Amino acid sequence: YWTDVFNKDVDGCGSDLDEYARRLLICALTYGHCHTLVDFPAPSGARSLAEERALNRRPYWIEVDPTNVYGWRLDREANYGNLTQVRIGEKAVVPDGEFGEKVYDQVRVIEPGRYRVFRQEEQKAEMQGPFPYPASFDQSDATAEYELVESGDFSLGQIPLVTIYANKTDTMTSKPPLLDIAHLNLAHYQRQAD
């Protein structure tokens, strides 16, 4: 059952496994690594596996850009290198009236067996570019107030985040594999411009 479902729709948005893997590869080549977070919909009251399948409740994969991973903690004692916490920046689009929407910065904090979501209290006023979403997170705003808007537990005893490396330097860090070529191209074009 799962093989057929994941081959057709791995992320809950209609992307098949090939398309999803292609996006991860592009991200890993760009940044040196990328992440996949495995999530599961909130409980819906289904009482059997057949009911869950009828409601299409199943795990799905979320591509996490490395620039949105704000920080992490590793177990340095018992199980060296295992994640004990990860903080992921997200955008929350909240309905505002009949037709409007508000976009908030939020941070998802995931630890083994539990998660919390903190949302910035004030909506970002400036929108950049032709899209209705802010272009990037403003991590420099240390005075921003965040409030806890969601929390919960899950039965998995570890953080469901998988990191794919193209050029690993350490846990959760890497060097973009094409960076040297980019610098060489830049130097070439600068010499040609003179």
Positions of PLM-derived features:
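Extended alpha-helical, oligomerization-prone segments that build pores/tubes and scaffolds
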Residues: Y1-D194
